[in-house]
């Protein structure tokens, strides 16, 4: 058995009468505030925050007989080209229709430009591809990942400026009397119109064939807030990029989900800039999600990675998880999609490393933030919405308080929660967060936090907090956080010990270990 103890330094550092139905009378007696902010309803009932796994890690089991604990993820799919019928389906440029592009060696595919491809032929091939990769219309995510060119002319800067240059050449060939300025204007109009029709009609086709899937484009919206070298970097999305996103209203109107990305480079490791970078990108997605209908916004599923984009064998730990996952949940999105490459599962060692990372780092943090978010939602929203920051640009996070909660890793690869919520915990939620109501629900935010007497929330694997709310942590049993063992032959490492997040595999099963995960800037304080 193993105890995962998230110390305060990590999350600050862990984490029918009178003719009326009785339920209505009870509801009317609960003091509430009207909520004016909305979020998309859950894709899966009773799963307000959805975790999806989209990495080719099945070979850990099929090749190396090393299963991975992905039980916390509602949707698990592989991005391999051979994989079909996945709950998360990602369409790359070679998997959906006749996507026009020019590769790095300047080879031209399908005309190279959206102006030159036959839309009719593209849709015919795309229909076949959709039916192949989605043989059944189950509930799931449909993500189109086309990154060779951008539908906004101005965003095709180097090296994507080849699409602007080729478009200008095309206009000049067709209209030899035009001067360069006129050719650029015509080329821009033709390119953007063709790109719009190409992307719009693809979305419409997907929705018509597989309406139970949520369709959208990966990396949309983006806000290009990656100039980390600028002094006093604040992560803000440039106004010009917000205006350009506004001009892409046609994408937001046809999409049924948004899929922004918050991948980190190693230069942002344990950096406050990472939180600012992620926060502003997610907030821009929230803004865009309301373009079509502020009272019925699009769901937002944020793509993230558990490794750095430039160091694919270095996992995200401690601060980095708070700066990515913690930020995303605190802003009130619909879920996250973990994407990865073959590097996660190429060898037996990489599979063992991934197994240990899941068990000791990622899964405990997912449990932490999931239960904290659900507890806040139950307290403030009566489970009819999600909690989101009152000040979106603050450092307020949804973490379990380490002073009265512990996450234990027990026998048979299971986790359990020890401790009780305190009134102070619930008041923190009320002070720092608001209820963002699910669309189509008459949701109100609860005001009488002091009257909440119980909390009952669970993750997917029935890891639960089912307990009374205590007035103070002093009411906890004296031995509530006492380490205990799988058998009498096992010894323990004292709870004040700190060990590396990268726990050796020999320590993953066996005697109790207390993980004290530290952070300089965390992010739960009462």
Curated annotation (Swiss-Prot):
Keyword set, alphabetical order: Cell membrane, Cytoplasmic vesicle, Disulfide bond, Glycoprotein, Glycosidase, GPI-anchor, Hydrolase, Lipoprotein, Membrane, Secreted, Signal
Glycosites: 165, 179
A Gene Ontology cellular-component term: acrosomal vesicle
Chief subcellular location: membrane
Its membrane topology: Lipid-anchor; GPI-anchor
InterPro entries to which the protein is assigned, alphabetical: Aldolase_TIM, Glycoside_hydrolase_SF, Hyaluronidase, Hyaluronidase_PH20/Hyal5
Listed GO biological process terms: carbohydrate metabolic process; fusion of sperm to egg plasma membrane involved in single fertilization; penetration of zona pellucida
Catalytic activity: Random hydrolysis of (1->4)-linkages between N-acetyl-beta-D-glucosamine and D-glucuronate residues in hyaluronate
Protein name according to UniProt: Hyaluronidase-5
Function: Catalyzes the hydrolysis of hyaluronan into smaller oligosaccharide fragments. Does not appear to be essential for fertilization.
Pfam families xref list: Glyco_hydro_56 (PF01630)
Knockout consequences: No visible phenotype. Viable and fertile.
GO molecular function: hyalurononglucosaminidase activity
EC number: 3.2.1.35
Keyword Lyase: no
Domain of life: Eukaryota
Signal peptide: 1-35
């Amino acid at each position: 058995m193993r105890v995962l103890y998230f110390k305060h330094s990590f999350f600050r550092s862990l984490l029918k009468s009178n003719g009326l139905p009785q339920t209505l009378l009870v509801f009317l007696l609960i003091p509430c505030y009207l909520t004016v902010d909305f979020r998309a309803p859950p894709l899966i009932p009773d799963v307000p925050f959805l975790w999806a796994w989209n990495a080719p890690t099945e070979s850990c089991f099929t090749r190396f007989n090393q299963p991975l604990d992905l039980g916390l993820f509602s949707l698990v799919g592989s991005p391999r080209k051979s994989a079909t019928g996945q709950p998360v389906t990602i369409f790359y440029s070679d998997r959906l229709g006749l996507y026009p592009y020019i590769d790095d060696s300047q080879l031209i595919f399908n005309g190279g430009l959206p102006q030159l491809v036959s839309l009719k032929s593209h849709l015919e091939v795309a229909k076949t591809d959709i039916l192949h990769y989605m043989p059944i219309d189950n509930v799931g995510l449909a993500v189109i990942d086309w990154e060779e060119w951008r539908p906004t002319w101005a965003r095709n800067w180097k090296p994507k400026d080849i699409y602007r240059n080729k478009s200008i050449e095309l206009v000049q060939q067709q209209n030899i009397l035009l001067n360069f300025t006129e050719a650029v204007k015509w080329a821009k109009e033709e390119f953007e119109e063709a790109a719009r029709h190409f992307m719009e009609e693809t979305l419409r086709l997907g929705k018509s064939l597989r309406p139970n899937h949520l369709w959208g484009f990966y990396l949309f919206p983006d806000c290009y807030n990656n100039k980390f070298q600028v002094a006093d970097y604040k992560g803000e999305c440039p106004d010009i990029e917000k205006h350009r996103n506004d001009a892409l209203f046609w994408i937001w109107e046809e999409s049924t989900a948004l899929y922004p990305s918050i991948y980190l480079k190693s230069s942002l490791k344990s950096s406050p800039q990472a939180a600012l970078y992620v926060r502003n990108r997610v907030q821009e997605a929230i803004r865009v999600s309301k373009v079509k209908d502020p009272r019925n916004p699009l769901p937002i599923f944020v793509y993230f990675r558990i490794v750095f984009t430039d160091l694919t064998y270095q996992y995200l730990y401690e601060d980095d998880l708070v700066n990515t996952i913690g930020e995303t949940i605190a802003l009130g999105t619909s879920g996250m999609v973990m994407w990865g490459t073959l590097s996660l599962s190429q060898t037996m060692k990489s599979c063992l490393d991934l197994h240990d990372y899941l068990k000791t780092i990622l899964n405990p943090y997912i449990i932490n933030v999931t239960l904290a978010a659900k507890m806040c939602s139950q307290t403030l929203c009566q489970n009819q919405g999600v909690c989101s920051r009152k000040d979106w640009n603050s450092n307020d996070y949804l973490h379990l308080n380490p002073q009265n909660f512990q996450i234990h890793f027990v026998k048979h690869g299971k986790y359990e929660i020890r401790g009780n919520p305190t009134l102070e915990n619930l008041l923190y939620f009320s002070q720092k967060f608001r209820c963002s109501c699910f669309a189509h629900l008459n949701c109100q935010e609860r005001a009488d936090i002091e009257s909440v007497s119980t909390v009952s929330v669970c993750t997917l694997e029935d890891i639960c907090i089912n307990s009374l709310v205590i007035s103070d942590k002093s009411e906890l049993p004296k031995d509530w956080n006492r380490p205990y063992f799988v058998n009498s032959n096992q010894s323990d490492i004292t709870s004040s010990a700190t060990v590396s997040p990268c726990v050796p595999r020999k320590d993953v099963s066996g005697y109790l270990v207390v993980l004290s995960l530290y952070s300089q800037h965390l992010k739960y304080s009462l």
